[in-house]
């Protein structure tokens, strides 16, 4: 019995080990097949992504293309036996869909395919408050000089003139370049986020009709009357500010013609006149004040109840003029002037009244955004070196970072249509392989 038992035991072990070996070989074969399948499926997916990137590159060259963009069959390389077809079509007035479809013949002769869809917006309405400073063009006689500092993004459709070492804390873009290349005399500017030339022109609106329409609907429209607007923050509570409107006789309580509750839900946040507008005071609320055909005058500091850098503030102010926005030459403005708001001059500039004859007035501090047709003068300087202020104001422009959100802006503040296409969504099909 002992010999038979030993024989049976040996045969049992041999059968068991043989069965295990057979299964291990089968599993190894399946693993190899599954890996090959996964690799081919991944290639199909990557082929669709490659097609999408080719399509985007073609749109970058010509954003007006519609319909079939490309149909390519590959006969070598990683995507051998692969094909992708890319087309772009309009699916609604504001959205285009670019679709990339791949086809890959696998080693088993089966064909797999994947789809990538990229949704793009051909029109982007953006607000000018995205810029800390912007000008439509720059005068060759007006310079950024040593002592000037801008926090935030800067752009000009023209040529940027620099003398000395002004500091630009955000990226600078200049469609027309610089008066002298950075690093060559007298342009020793400090660009903290770099600079770029030859960028696309950003168009200004043809008029301020949107503000006129808003003022005539649920805002305050004063027609052809000059107005003086004094902002009053009310109490220490939030959102209880007022705007007091005076007639042409000026700052006297007897001349008040309107009291505007800025928290009134029926008020859309716009106060406007086609004539000159004079502004001062402290804002609690959301407001745009505009002179739609003339100039605006800053009579004293124009502040928010809570500083724009306070994370709890929701105050936001727009100061919009067809012509100049003028820092008045008066006692209140002769020792610094501070403005919390977004300033927009459609045809002219932000300037200091009598900038070349008034004394040295310290700093013009703007916390917000400045957009002007052409750069205006707020002071004069001796080019040195070093460049030294001789009259008017030195510029201290700080960007209100809240304005970097395109959806956050003063009521009915001017905007522009951005060029090109913006990717708003990217969708990829995902296949779950059926491994065996």
Report each predicted region and the residues it spans.
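Beta-strand/loop motifs with alternating small/hydrophobic and polar/acidic residues, enriched
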Residues: 2-158, 168, 433-436
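Short gly/pro/ser/thr-enriched loop/turn and capping motifs at secondary-structure boundaries
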Residues: 53, 179-181, 350-351
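Short, solvent-exposed loop/turn segments that connect beta-strands within catalytic domains
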Residues: 93, 106-112, 236-238, 313, ...
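General beta-strand recognition
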Residues: 97-99, 297, 351
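Beta-strand residues in well-ordered beta-sheet regions across diverse protein folds
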Residues: 99-101, 290, 353
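Primarily marks folded extracellular/lumenal domains of secretory and cell-surface proteins
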Residues: 125-330, 345, 401-436
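Extended C-terminal subregions enriched in glycine
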Residues: 313-389
